């Protein structure tokens, strides 16, 4: 079995090496192959230089995709999915707010129950203002009333997908992509796993 991690990066010069070192420690000697796919989304800092260094010192399990300018996280996710080769593919941020260790828990869920094709993480403890939380709750209530598909409140892009889900997502031709909507639209059974969003290791939220 092979696991692919797709890691969008925008101005993450202070975090990408920490992420790489942490992920390498988490996934070594676990009995499966894995690859790290870093997608530099037109960063204006030294993120690309740091990624080049990682690529030079790493084994062959590291890929780096670089955009000429900032196209946005949705485009970075799509590019990473296209590069992925794993039977399971995880979308995870580079800022360490989503801990790589949690991916093992997500994998265990899919290994245990073949009826699920994806694990999506949602924020159990929102470390944000009451106003922002209320706004988000209102957004999900409105969109669920007006949409044919249901969106889980607090769900993030942090998720693990079987290859069949990845292939279905890549087959869709939408130019302006909304990943959470697409993941719901393709219709595979999803397990929602609560998690606590950690503080950023370095820098500020994008």
Kindly label every feature range from the protein language model:
Residues 34-37, 48-83:
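Conserved donor nucleotide-binding strand/loop of the catalytic core
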